[in-house]
């Protein structure tokens, strides 16, 4: 049951209400949201010499932000941030890239491209979040109750459906690593073993 979430709605991050007495003292500390956001530039990412390394570097940078965001003036935000380690990595410049490639916005090729692009963002943020969890021995709060922990989150990816299909989109991603079903299965097993550091990772703000 979702009782609260942030109003910007670029990310669905669950909050919990606090219980406060008449003296304005916490009887039960709730959790609120710190928006630790960043954005990839689609044009630049598609010409990056190493797409995955670029995303992993962004995850490290945003992890520093979330680890450093101690908003003690609002204890519920500090509490929620320390439990979830949340960031939101998104994208800007999609229309610019499609125009550059003479692909009509909303065409089948544009939809296919966007699906693959965000699949790669998802994959590489998961990879690095798992690496950080393994290094630190820390996962986000209640990781063990998540679909990441039991592996079912990865089912749609281990089916091998998320690969470029049209010749045009294959051309756009030429030279960029596209994870196979086996790669997703390997990542699933690593996440089940060592967890994820971040509760949320993606947001288009």
Task: Write out the residue ranges for each language-model feature.
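Short, contiguous, pocket-lining structural segments
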Residues: 54, 86-90, 121
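Active-site lining segments that contact anionic ligands and/or coordinate catalytic metals
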Residues: 32-34, 84, 197-201
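Function-dense linear segments that define catalytic or interfacial modules
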Residues: 1-81, 91-101
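Internal maturation/activation junctions in enzymes
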Residues: 55-78, 104-205
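Flexible, active-site-adjacent loop/turn segments at secondary-structure boundaries
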Residues: 35-40, 85-87, 103, 141, ...
